């Protein structure tokens, strides 16, 4: 019973800390990661369909690299 209460309090505390940190850092991020394929396709660093690619580099505009070519 005590352990359950301690775990619940710890989870609530960690959640509150994350929310506070996220609220404080809003708009201050300088190098934002490309998170969607729409943003990735507008980037000049991505490769078009049929171009050679590497699965490790994530450099296709479509977001998928199969058999060494962007899909």
UniProtKB/Swiss-Prot annotation:
> What does UniProt note about where in the body, tissue by tissue, this protein is expressed?
Expressed by the venom duct.
Kindly list the residues the record flags as site (Binds Cav2.2/CACNA1B calcium channel): 49, 55, 58, 62, 64, 66
The record ties this protein, via Pfam families, to:
Conotoxin
Does the UniProt entry include the keyword RNA-binding? no
Signal peptide from the UniProt entry: 1-22
Residue ranges annotated as propeptide are 23-45
Q: What is its main location?
A: secreted
Give, from the UniProt record, the effect of changing residue 57 to A: In omega-4; 2.11-fold decrease in inhibition of Cav2.2/CACNA1B and decrease in efficacy to kill goldfish (LD(50) is 1.80 mg/kg by intramuscular injection)
GO CC aspect terms:
extracellular region; host cell presynaptic membrane
- Give me the disulphide-bonded residues: 46-61, 53-65, 60-70
**What stretches pass through the bilayer?**
none
Which PROSITE patterns does UniProt cross-reference here?
OMEGA_CONOTOXIN
Effect annotated for changing residue 58 to R: Loss of inhibition of human Cav2.2/CACNA1B
Q: Which residues carry this modification: Cysteine amide?
A: 70
Q: What is the effect of changing residue 56 to I?
A: In omega-5; 1.8-fold decrease in inhibition of Cav2.2/CACNA1B and decrease in efficacy to kill goldfish (LD(50) is 0.93 mg/kg by intramuscular injection)
Homology family: Belongs to the conotoxin O1 superfamily.
Q: What's the entry's take on its domains?
A: The presence of a 'disulfide through disulfide knot' structurally defines this protein as a knottin. The cysteine framework is VI/VII (C-C-CC-C-C).
Instruction: Report the protein's function.
Output: Omega-conotoxins act at presynaptic membranes, they bind and block voltage-gated calcium channels. This toxin blocks Cav2.2/CACNA1B calcium channels (IC(50)=0.67-208 nM). It acts by neutralizing the outer electronegativity and sterically hindering the ion access path to the entrance of the channel selectivity filter. It also shows antiproliferative effects on different glioma cell lines (M059J, U-138MG and U-251MG). In vivo, is lethal to fish. In vivo, injection into mammals induces adverse effects, such as tremor, diminution of spontaneous locomotor activity and bad coordinated locomotion.
This protein is called: Omega-conotoxin MVIIA
